Amino acid sequence: MADPYEFLMCIHNPEEDTLTRNFPIPATPLDQNTKDISLNPDRKTSLRIFRPPTKEPPVTKNKLLPIIIYFHGGGFILFNADSTMNHDFCQSIATHIPALVVSVDYRLAPENRLPAAYDDAVDALNWVKDQGLGKLNNSEVWLKEYGDFSKCFIMGCSSGANVAYHASLRAIEMDLEPAKINGLILHCPFFGSLERTESDSKVINNQDLPLAVRDVMWELALPLGSTRDHVYCNPNIDHDGSSSGNMVGLIERCFVVGFYGDPLIDRQIQLVKMLEEKGVKVETWIEQGGYHGVLCFDPMIRETFLEKLKHFILNDEFIY
């Protein structure tokens, strides 16, 4: 294929390790059912909060809304919470479930290589916790009036699903009370390794996400000097002999969505197998056709997904 940077419409500036992004990314402004909140001013991170169309807060606790902490895709290097495809996807989730969606505008690579996005995810989890405790001077009224802190979920798409996965591992070791994480939701999760899979080889020049582009994304996102067998990329690798592999089994409940038209499908199936082997209760929706990140673009497939997501979220079990 052509130069992957041309495909991405980006220029890497290696001396500063920055990226000039020329990729056209339309953004959606706020409306009455969305708002932007600063998360960490020092890190210049923020949250975009979505609520279902409504005028009055719930009257009783059993009418409160689940809280979904969401991480967008973009190979760790592109897009934001206000990017139109991410905005529309989160708004559809908030409306259909219904739920409050807290979309995290985390730091991008290579300016902020991993684990920066994971650290921002921890900030978001702690922010939700502090909202539940009422510790912040300027408490977010939507969470206070609409949010059920006993029903929180961590969700992501593509590289955002990678962030969600690592955030869920960190959440296990955090005291998040009164927030309780009920499950992990992974849409077309973005993982890799040095070893190629069959689906990698079959669709090297996949028009949506070519192999060379995926490799460049990892080169820009991983810590300098790392390979794709780093634990941030390959979930089958334990980091420095740590207990991260054992921690995976404590997730217990996960919903994985994948499509056979996605060149990453083999990795997603491997992820499901690994989770199940470690004792995680995994629900899957793996369909023929489709492509990487299809739910953010195809409203018809999204409709089917939203019904399945609603079923998963309305399960009353919570994990940690």
Swiss-Prot record:
UniProt record, GO biological process: alkaloid metabolic process
KW Thylakoid (keyword) present: no
Keyword line: Alkaloid metabolism, Hydrolase
Pfam families given in the database record: Abhydrolase_3 (PF07859)
Xref: InterPro entries: AB_hydrolase_3 (IPR013094), AB_hydrolase_fold (IPR029058), Carboxylest/Gibb_receptor (IPR050466), Lipase_GDXG_HIS_AS (IPR002168)
Reaction catalysed by this enzyme: 3-O-acetylpapaveroxine + H2O = narcotine hemiacetal + acetate + H(+)
GO molecular-function terms, A-Z: hydrolase activity
Active site: S158, D262, H292
Assigned EC number: 3.1.1.105
Pathway(s) it belongs to: Alkaloid biosynthesis
Family membership noted in the UniProt record: Belongs to the 'GDXG' lipolytic enzyme family.
Function according to Swiss-Prot or TrEMBL: Carboxylesterase involved in the biosynthesis of the benzylisoquinoline alkaloid noscapine. Converts 3-O-acetylpapaveroxine to papaveroxine which spontaneously rearranges to narcotine hemiacetal.
Protein name, as recorded: 3-O-acetylpapaveroxine carboxylesterase CXE1
Lineage of source species: Eukaryota, Viridiplantae, Streptophyta, Embryophyta, Tracheophyta
